[in-house]
Amino acid sequence: MSTVDIDSLVEQICSLDLCKAAELVEKMEQKLGFPKGGLLTAVPAAGGNQVEGGAAAEEKTDFSVVFESYAADKKISVIKAVRECTSLGLKEAKEFVEKEGAKELIEGKKYKKEEAEEIKKKLEDAGAKVSIK
């Protein structure tokens, strides 16, 4: 077929009413051997880059470091590590460590992945339980 034939074919297809278009699709699926249910079951939705749960596959770049708990016998080393990783003084670092429950290391502060991993390792080596979110 030449391009002129393709152009006229496109015009003819576009002029079909909904019933005729559905019939055309069904016959094309049969002729080409597509599975029952059509192409929509085999082809991902437009926008494609999606992961489970519908979240975008875009890689996250900003992370929070969440301090969860610490080993009681490592309290002093954990306080020192918290002071190293933040600008907190001794009293504030001690209060932070002793406060119950999971909390961000620095409220609202986001870190690059490498920096967050480094902080996590430093705190875990000191005896803290830390996660990155």
UniProtKB/Swiss-Prot annotation:
Single GO biological process annotation from the record: translation
Molecular-function GO term, any one: mRNA binding
Top-level taxon: Bacteria
Keyword Protein transport recorded: no
Pfam families: Ribosomal_L12 (PF00542)
Gene Ontology CC terms, in alphabetical order: ribonucleoprotein complex; ribosome
Keywords: Ribonucleoprotein, Ribosomal protein
CDD domains (alphabetical): Ribosomal_L7_L12
Quaternary state and interactors: Homodimer. Part of the ribosomal stalk of the 50S ribosomal subunit. Forms a multimeric L10(L12)X complex, where L10 forms an elongated spine to which 2 to 4 L12 dimers bind in a sequential fashion. Binds GTP-bound translation factors.
UniProt record similarity statement: Belongs to the bacterial ribosomal protein bL12 family.
Xref: HAMAP family: Ribosomal_bL12
Function: Forms part of the ribosomal stalk which helps the ribosome interact with GTP-bound translation factors. Is thus essential for accurate translation.
Stated name of the protein: Large ribosomal subunit protein bL12
Species name: Ehrlichia chaffeensis (strain ATCC CRL-10679 / Arkansas)
Gene, per the UniProt record: rplL
